Amino acid sequence: IMAESMKGLKRTHRCGELSASQAGQTVTIMGWVQKNRNKGGLVFVDVRDRSGVIQVVFEEGKADAALLEKAAKLRAEYVVAITGRVEMRSGAVNENLATGEIEIIPESLRILSESETPPFPIEENSKTKEEVRLKYRYLDLRRPDLQRNLRMKSHVMTLTRQFFAGEGFLEVETPMLGKTTPEGARDYLVPSRVH
């Protein structure tokens, strides 16, 4: 499967922002495939983005054969764009998901990027060794607990900046007060006549 173009695509909603109030609407979501369960003629795909997870249901009779076949080939961490109709779940509500009372019935599926099997599961409270998580930091940052930490840090930093700006402070970044970069970049010297 080749990666498909994003030309003409625009996300209308984030996965975790969907709710029963959007039932009947056509939406476009983009995200990573978290799980793919193929029940033969019925494929359940959980799609995750930074806001949460939504279930997409590819069903024989509702989706054409090519779409069903494409969905069956999806693997963990593939990046996809899906356009479909939001519907109330016909089966049991999933209490573990904020979007557990709805699902998307797809009209189109685009695979934006394929992925090899990740070295560890992208899930909360992963039991993976820290050494492996740090080696694949770009994957580790997709985990829900780290996403929460990043959002909290961003929120605190924004509030702090707003407070000090409101008090008339000016934010200044100077080379002498900045952090050093341990990735091999050399610190640059600033000539000074003081020393």
What do these predicted regions represent?
Residues 1-195:
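Class II aminoacyl-tRNA synthetase catalytic cores and aaRS-like
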